[in-house]
Amino acid sequence: MRVSLRRASTEAIAAFILTFAFLLALAPSAPFTRELGVCESGAVRDVIAGNIILPHFLPGPMVHVPPLYWWTAALDVRAFGWTEIALRMPSMIAAAFTCAIVFMWASIAINRRTAFWSAMSLLTCHFFLDAARQPRMDSMLALFVTAAAIAFERALRPSRDDSSAPIDLRSRHVGLALAAIAMGLGILTKGILGILLPGLVAGLYLVVRRRIRDLFRIDLIFTFFVALAIGLSWYFAAYEVGGQKFLQWQLTMNLWSRFVPAEAGGAGYCVHPFWYFTPHTIAGFIPWSAYLPAVAIYAWRRRGRKLPEAMVFTLCWFAAIFLFFSTSRGKCLIYILPAFPPLAVLTGIVIDAAICSRRESEISAADSTVGANQAPEARDRAFAIAFAVATAVVTVAAIAFALAALAIVIFSLPRGLSPQLHPTDRRFLELFTSLAASRSPALFVLIAACSASGVAGIIGLRRRDPQLQSVSVLIVAVAGSIFWFGVLNPALAERETLRDFAREVARTVPSGNEVAHLGLSDCDLNFYSPQPLTPIYRLRCDESSSSPDFVVARKVDFDTTRVANRACFKPILESPPVDSNGSRLLLQRIP
């Protein structure tokens, strides 16, 4: 059942509150370790110091994208202090808003049940939750791209679209205005992607629907001009501050180098094959990725005019973003985040379709003869099988995990398994084993949830009840998310963080003394230090050396330094070996 705009808005506010509360339960104050966004926290320091227009990564170069994220993070630091939750807050709020507007749009354009499952599959998929806890701008970009795409759908839908109320001129103009604002904010978040991604979505949709003339409508073109004006306002202001150096940095580093091969002048980082994002998208959408074959079957069997208009748009939305990043030369994993909201909507559509199909078949069975029902049942059989198989896979996995966890609680972990794993996986397994040994309540809650999920899945499969099957997947998705991000990850962070070492360094070094860092900097060490560590790339003991009296270095780097260059430094503090880089040392120059 579709709902009115007013009611959908009220329910979206409730969805935002519940989503944000869920994110707050996932240990947002856990210590930082090696998150990429922590390396960029120096820009927040610079904004707080007063360099608002063109902040720099302290220590480091000027920012590589517009600073909307760092502006909002600076406001949160003012409110909550220099803490982990302050830097994570912008991403958490953006993620909650993304779920809320997905829910609101699906309620209006499709129905409330699709809206519920779309929002829940987005909120509880691994990739989206992980990004929501990262102190960087990607969740904000995903929010504005999602908002712009949805606004375009409201503005560009056909006048006789049966899936929602016919569009009028006022609704079209409101939709385009909202799209312009969202794209402008997207530019202020991560540059050209803020306008390019929604533009590709709208363009592909119009091409697929053979509405080529609409691409050249004055109001649509004007929408992009307004968005550019909003975004370019920062670029003009930053050029006034940074001059030619800023212009060259933006054009060469952040536009040209990311999309061309290294041999043609590109940067050559995050280079991966065309199919790179496919397995990562499937893995990142766990456990809901089990339903993707059902999504494909449903869309293929109803291709053309049989598909609801909202689903056609959502398919174009996902395809435009996914194909764009797949063809890009640089493919950093986090780039694909804006593709997850449409993927969640497709999942919600399919879950709703499975539930409706089951209910329609029950009604038909009661009112019709067997022969009259054979055609529609044959048409939907492959879809129903794919949906049931997906549920069965998740059910088996949930039961297997519950049994394995109980076995570890009772018998402990078999010897010889841990050394064969990746170091990070080994640490996770060690933490899991310690939770089992201590009979952690969180672990028993997870076991109970997986057992309940398995039971619900089995009952749903026996009754051929898609709604109960979906609930079984939701149970394990929620419980797994809370355990992974609220229990295991914070525990691992406590083991791997340099927070305590940074605080000990701050207590040891006399106030006012500069502290340097030898070689590659540790991002969390910079975050937890009272002031950014000055980077140096070699130790020197000659009298002309201007090295600070205190230097932080990785022990392996200090040990491999020439004796003549390290003879004048002595270690006075040593951290535990928290990661594969080993211990860190605080060195003091010998007078």
Where are these regions (language model features)?
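Membrane-integral, polyisoprenol-dependent glycosyltransferases
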Residues: M1-S364, T369, I385, V389, ...
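Membrane-embedded architecture of ER/inner-membrane glycosylation machinery
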Residues: R2-S4, A177, Y298-P591
